[in-house]
């Protein structure tokens, strides 16, 4: 039970972090969403062998972590939870692309390894920025920003319900695991048959509880429309935040600054 609640479904911490009062938290949600979108588009548009050109993009997530007071250890744990998906995508690249593209002293590095590390780096940056966006904005505020930016309301409401009902699923799963632990000998005897039965009961119990929650929402006047906690208003300095970072991302995208600096240093040394 503790593993379910604290290791994999530790989503309540995000909401707690989002209630802080920092410069990043005070930014309009739409500004943060647009800046994150520009960042993600620029990062994923690089070629498979580009690594040095990606490094300057680390400035933005590090800026958000420091200024937004986001716990770095917590963020890295959440990124690592999804890391196996990126590893599975690029794990066979070193076997498929064996042409040596880079030498580090006597050690030759093939294009497959370079592309593999490029996939991991892009994954960590994009997922990290998405998590920081939620941690410094709040899930409800992100959904409100999407709705104000023209995303279909049906889709936004589904995202909100997914977030809310995930807590319901975790609560029901915790109850079932606790009940099973109390009725078994040190948690033994979890066969596939028992696991399948528990999964089926979990689905039925979650659907039943979600239906009761929906009925309660209708009784309280829910009509499918999202209502912000406070009005959204973009200020001039927030527009400068968006334009400044977007200009930085585009500059780093079209100019390989680390390579230019390396060439410049070699010229001075020689």
Residue ranges and their predicted role:
Residues 31, 52, 152-156:
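Membrane-interface starts of transmembrane alpha-helices
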Residues 33-34, 54-58, 76-79, 83, ...:
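Hydrophobic alpha-helical transmembrane segments
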Residues 69-76:
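Membrane-interface helix-boundary motifs at transmembrane edges
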Residues 78-185:
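Juxtamembrane/interface alpha-helical elements of multi-pass membrane proteins
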Residues 1-49, 56-66, 171-270:
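Transmembrane alpha-helix interface motif
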Residues 59-69, 83-88:
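Alpha-helical transmembrane segments and their membrane-interface exit regions
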């Amino acid at each position: 039970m503790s593993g379910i609640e604290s290791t994999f479904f530790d989503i309540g911490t995000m909401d707690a972090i989002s209630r802080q009062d920092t410069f990043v938290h005070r930014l309009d949600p739409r500004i943060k969403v647009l800046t994150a979108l520009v960042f993600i588009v620029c990062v994923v548009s690089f070629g498979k062998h580009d690594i040095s050109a990606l490094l300057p993009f680390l400035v933005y997530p590090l800026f958000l972590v420091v200024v937004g007071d986001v716990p770095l250890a917590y963020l890295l744990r959440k990124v690592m939870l999804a890391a196996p998906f990126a590893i599975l995508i690029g794990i066979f690249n070193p076997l498929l692309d064996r042409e040596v593209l880079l030498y580090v002293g006597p050690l030759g590095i093939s294009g497959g390894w370079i592309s593999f590390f490029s996939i991991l780096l892009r994954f960590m940056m994009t997922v990290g920025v998405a998590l920081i966006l939620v941690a410094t904005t709040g899930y409800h505020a992100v959904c409100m920003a999407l709705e104000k930016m023209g995303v279909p309301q049906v889709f936004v409401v589904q995202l909100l319900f997914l977030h809310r009902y995930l807590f319901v699923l975790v609560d029901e799963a915790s109850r079932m695991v606790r009940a099973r632990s109390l009725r078994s000998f040190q948690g033994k005897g979890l066969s596939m048959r028992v696991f399948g039965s528990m999964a089926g009961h979990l689905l039925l119990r979650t659907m039943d509880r979600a239906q009761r929650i929906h009925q309660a929402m209708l009784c309280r006047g829910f009509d499918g429309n999202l209502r912000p906690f406070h009005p959204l208003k973009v200020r001039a300095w927030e527009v400068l935040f968006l334009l400044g970072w977007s200009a930085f991302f585009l500059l780093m995208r079209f100019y390989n600054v680390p390579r230019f600096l390396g060439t410049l240093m070699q010229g001075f040394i020689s």
